Structure formats: C-alpha cells, structure tokens
Design a protein with these regions (language model features):
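C-terminal output helix
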Residues: 105, 123-132
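Non-catalytic signal-transmission and effector/linker regions of two-component phosphorelay proteins
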Residues: 1-20, 62, 129, 133-144
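Short amphipathic alpha-helix used as the core "switch/output" element in two-component signaling
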Residues: 54-57, 80-92, 109
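Acidic, metal-coordinating helix/loop segments flanking the phosphotransfer/catalytic sites
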Residues: 45-67
Length: 144
C-alpha cells in the first residue's frame, strides 16, 4: 500500500485518511483529534518525536500515514528532529507544523524544507481540517 492510506477501512468504517498528531500537550492532541475525527479522519497520537517515530514504524501503522501534524518544542526528540526524520524516511507524507510560536523566519525555513503548512496554536478546527485536506490534495497530485 506504500506510504498512503487514503480511502482505507478501519473495521467497517471507511475513513478520509490517517493523520499522526505529534504534540507533548495532551489537551492539544485531544482538540486536534476531535476536529479531525469530525471530518472522518483516523487519528494516531504521539507525545514527542521519539514516540512518533516508534508509532510510524510499528506494525500496521508502517507506511500507512497520509499526513503528520507536528509541534516543534517537545521533550526527547523535538519537532525539528522529527520532521527531519520524516522528510528523509517518508518524503511523500506531507508535514504540517502546529506550534505555539508565531515565528515568521521559522515558518519560512520549514516551508522551504517542504513542510506544507505552518499553523499557530490555538487553531480553529475548520482551519486545521482545511490544512489537512490541502496537504492530502497536494500529496495526491504529486502521485500523478
């Protein structure tokens, strides 16, 4: 199935795709998860980059991600390191940065590195869903 899972089934329920949320704040992960599940996405969670790497490489999750949403400042493996890992090992999986730090230089740097969007917390559910939909659309266009 490659790096993509769009249109796959979880049990009897079709989903719009699988998204991994990487953030050290449980409340943020919960809000993001609820916003994306409302739009029909299957959501995985990790509290830091180390757990994200474990999650993306584990069993049925391996290579079955459509989008990764990643915070920057986290313990253990931070977002910068996690994003570098994803870019190098899963180059077709779109990355969205979701951070509490509205830094234009940082945003520009990440966008130049191939991150598809840079969102600042708190983010509205609709804006988040739109960013994920755009990321998935870009990924699908890249497959053609």
């Amino acid at each position: 199935m490659g790096e993509y899972s769009s249109g796959f089934f979880m049990g009897d329920k079709p989903t719009n795709g699988r998204v991994l949320i990487v953030d050290d704040e449980a409340d943020i992960r919960k809000v993001v998860r609820m916003a994306l599940q409302k739009a029909g996405y299957d959501v995985l969670e990790a509290e830091n980059g180390e757990k994200a790497i474990e999650t993306i490489n584990a069993g049925e999750n391996r290579l079955l991600l459509d989008v990764v949403i990643c915070d920057i400042r986290m313990p253990k493996i931070n977002g910068v390191e996690a994003i570098a890992y994803f870019r190098s090992n899963y180059p077709r999986v779109p990355l969205i940065v979701l951070t509490g730090f509205p830094d234009t230089d940082m945003a520009t740097s990440f966008l130049r590195q191939g991150v598809v969007d840079y969102l600042v917390k708190p983010v509205e559910g609709e804006k988040l869903r739109e960013a994920v939909a755009r990321a998935m659309e870009q990924r699908e266009l890249a497959r053609l």
